[in-house]
Amino acid sequence: MDVAAHLTEMRARAREFGTRYAVAETGLRASRRLTQWLEDTLLEMEGSRGVLGPAHEQWRDNSTAENRRRWNEWDWSTKGEEWNASESWKEALIEDVMLPVIPTGGTVLEIGPGGGRWSVVLAPRAKKLIVVDVAQKPLEVVAERLGDADNLECLLSDGASLTGVDDHSVDSIWSFDVFVHIRPRDQAAYLSEIARVLKPGGVAAIHHSDGRNRGDAPSREGWRAPMSAPLFASLAHERGLEVDKQLREWSAGQHDLGAFHDVITVLRAPLR
């Protein structure tokens, strides 16, 4: 809102409720904008330094309860395919990012399968596919979509752990369009669990945010949780995982992660 429009609205409020009310309301709006700016500034500073500081730890949105409600109520009729930038974008992501880190055979774990748009690619490659989600509805959608697949196991998550998955039992992990909606402290908890369940030499490819004020989209769009490439790498290292690479584009730069400028971090469990 420009200054002239703001003054016009303030005068209207003063006529309707009185000057004191108008001044108080204006102050409240300014205070909220300042609070948001301070929060974004702290998040940016912590993220750039790779520190899980108070701004990240105290992040209020993107809780387990909110995620469970949102994805149980979501319209999964298009199976999550509406989030693909294009069919060629999806095919290139599969060929150039997913398949190189997901070996044929073995046990594959997918965190947050959504409507199963990646599960249908992973299932034929895996000896066993474990899909974990915080909401029951996506698990039902995936089970229906994969039909008679006899290598599928569906697990309901508490939003921060991989309960039901044995230690060092998983060869590879895939998660896309999921961690961007998980609050930072729960992302950290999931990384601890990833370190626990991966076999030595196992690989995980995790798509996550890279800052809240980068890219072409406003910082508050998309119901997204704050994270950064340096912070995610730092959290992974603290849990004994190796960062193999962090991708922002693929197919020789033909495709990327869109307006939010996210990152796919490829992690590896060290050989023991």
PLM region descriptions:
Residues 1-105, 109-164, 182-189, 193, ...:
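Class I (Rossmann-like) S-adenosyl-L-methionine-dependent methyltransferase catalytic domain
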Residues 163-173:
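A short acidic, Gly/Pro-enriched loop at the edge of an enzyme's catalytic core
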Residues 172-185:
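A short SAM/SAH-binding and catalytic strip from SAM-dependent methyltransferases
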Residues 196-199:
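Short, cationic motifs built from Arg/Lys/His that form the positively charged side of catalytic pockets
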